[in-house]
């Protein structure tokens, strides 16, 4: 089994203050890996560098065999991203948002399957503006998996989840891992 993510000597500073200082990390294909730590520990910075959305000051990063800083569309087609917050979709329904996002991928999952997987079947045709915080978070997870990615980045994915939603989320993560999906997530707990 190959490494999905390899990081060596990763460094990133903001205004002279190190957010990440010399991180080495290997995540195997199909592994579920969590970065655990308090606010300001560099978890989100590390994930954003691995996603290719933030530049690094030093170090080597390979994600699915590619340096994310120069990665193209075919590489991005292999990853799913769930950020800490999302916005701009309030006038759509979850079904519309997922269907729209699915169109940018070459092999997306079935939208109704994703809606069921994230527990939004009863809210699929409700405007997103009318969803609770936990329901919006479930939609964020759906948006991250609808492309059928090989690798999913989840930044604080269970924020706003009630206990049952959190259990359902971990069941979904186990199912994705059982299908061979690599998962990198950040969490405080």
Where are these regions (language model features)?
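Catalytic Walker B motif of ABC-type/P-loop ATPase nucleotide-binding domains
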Residues: 152-155
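Conserved ABC ATPase "signature" region
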Residues: 99, 103, 108-124
